[in-house]
Structure formats: C-alpha cells, structure tokens
Amino acid sequence: MTFLDHHKLASVIIDRIDPARVTRDLSELITIRSVNPFDDAPSPGCREEELAEIYLAKMQAIRLETGRVDVVDGRPNIWGRLKGKGQGPVVMLAGHMDTVGTDGYPDAFSGRIENGLVYGRGACDMKAALAAFLEVARAIRESAVELPGDLLLVGLCDEEHMMLGSKDFGRTGPKADFAIVGEPTSLRICPAHSGQRTFFIRTYGTAVHSSRPERGVNAIVHMARVINALEGYGENLKRAQHHPLCGYGRFSPGVIRGGSISSAVPDFCELEIDRRFLPGETSEQIVAELRARIDPLAASDNSFRYEIVGPALDVAALDTPVGSPIVLSLVNAATHLFGSPPEIDAFPGGTDAPNLDCPAVVCGPGDLAQAHTLDEYVEVDQVVKAVQLYIHAIVDLMETRT
C-alpha cells in the first residue's frame, strides 16, 4: 500500500469521527471517581472498577472482544480487541484509568464543558486519551474498513502509584507488536523517558538521654554527614553519560525521618532519595555511586553505621529507537495532518509504556502542566486531533510486517 493509499484509507475512517461524541465520552469518564487508593484498601471512588465497568460496556457496544483481569480485588485491567484480517501487526492503544487525589478540588468530577475545554480530575491525565481510543475504534467500525491487523484498546490500573496494572499486563495480558500510551504530551512524540528509583539511606546510632549526649551516637548527626557527602552528586550526573533524548540522570533527597523526642539522642535516621536514571543504568550502578560517597565516612569513624535499602519504587526507563516503525508511523501521520514534522522528545515522567512488552511510544492529548492541578482541563480540539493522529498512524503501521 502506498502512502497515498494510506491517506485515502485514513480519510475514510476520519470522516466518521464525531467530536461531540468524544467530548461527551470524556465528560462522562471524568464524572466517574477512579482515584488511586495508593496504599489503602480499594473503596468506592478510590479504585478503577467503576470506570472499568463503564469502559467495558462502551467497548462492547462497539462490538469489541473484551476481557478483564483483576490485578488486586476491585482493581482490574481491561481490554477490547477490534479484529482485523490477521495479516498485520497488533497495535495497542493503552492508558491508565486511575487518577491522583482531589483534596482541595471541589469540581474534580464535574466533567464541565466550556469554551472548547473539558474540566475535571483526569481530564488530561489521562481520560482524554481513553475517550480518544474509543472514538478511534468507533470510527473504524462505522467506516466498515477492515484493518490488516488487530487493534487492542487497554485500560490499566495503578499507574499513579506502583504501576501494578501495566506490570501485570506486560506479563500476562494479550500481546501486541506496538503500543501507543496516551499520556499528555500535547501530541509530541515521546519514544523515551528516564526511569525512577527511590532508595532509603539509613544511619544507626545509640540512644541515650539527651542530658548525656556524649554517651550515645546520634544517628541524625551521622545523616547530616551523609547529606554533606552527597552534595555535588547531582552536578556530577550532569557531566556523566547523556542520552540523546533524556539528557542526564538526576538525584534529589526528598524525605527525612529521625528521632522521636528531643530529650533522647536518636538511634535511627532515614533519608529517602529519588534517582531519575537513564535507559541502561542499573540499580547496582546507582548503589555503587552512593556507596562511593558514603563509605569513606565509615572508614574514618568506627561509630558510623549505615545501610542503603531499595529500590522501594522502581519505574522502568523507556528507550524505543527513533527508527522504530511505531515512531516513524506517528511522525508520518503528524507531518501529514499538521503540516510539519512533529517534535520528538523524552517524556518528563515515568509511564506504563516500558512495561507492555513491545516497542512503545508516549503520545497523547493534553498539556502535562495541567496534570494533577486543581483546575485540570484539556482542549477538545486536541483530543479530536489525537483521534486523527492515532488513526493515521495505525493505518500506516498496519502495513508493517512483524
């Protein structure tokens, strides 16, 4: 099939897009409370199940083959398959169903539509993409176009916390050859992002009454020495290896805990650190870098005791080659639709994309700066453009031989 044929076929499908319908879908999805419960037990309004049930029903109404697996009770992954001819790749459109919390956000679930914007928690992160995925499948179905390969729509749980959904789906879910994850990129094409690992550095001392501090060992004082030893680590990362899209790794001390009462010398202190790492960097490398700075403290002071625990959080890095068919198809689609080559960049945060067991790209409607805010919104026009972009890319990608 030539590029002109791709364009004609995509245009037939795009003609079936209904902007009012995709806007209504998005507004409805926002009204469904799917806040991530984080470490608490799932409860009404704090789990993905209610949204999953509505989304499954919408996929079934389009006559997709659907499935559901609960990763934990009340927290499912779901999917719908639009069958093709069996002669092309399986393309996945994936997004998470959970959102962050809504404290201080009274209109979080309004789904208000005003002046070309849709407001509410999850509007851009990332229910806009979920609504766009539905419209892609509907437009294909209503156009009566039979694709060479299958289209797989996937809703994932727990992205905002431990990414349990995508980790489970990558291991046990239906397989795809390529995936687009619709996180808010303002339709920039992001085939890479750094990973994230958090570690705990713990110092130990000897507790005594603070009237005789010289008889004990102060774990907080030792942690202060650790913090001093780590000064400059972030700057060193800037001068170390670079990734063509992700740039350099980053380090940030984030949380410190220690002591119980001021009248006791503390015997324990803990520092939680965040390390954004480049594709290819390992936990062992990171721990070795930390130890190289802290071990000299122990060598010069017999009372200095510490350990490094983790990673507690481990979000994988993404590194899909820019020459991958999924990247090239999105570039071709965006160039045709919007008149100029699109920006190819690294996504600033972590996503489900590297867990899906296939080449993946992050690309979706919405501005990441609006995510997690108390006035979250997305432009309807960009959601519709996302539907067009996905359709063009899918039609192009379906000619890829895997």
Name these PLM-found stretches:
Residues 104, 114-116, 136-152, 230-240, ...:
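Phosphate-handling active-site elements
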Residues 2-119, 146-147:
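Acidic/His- and Gly-rich active-site-bordering loop/insert found
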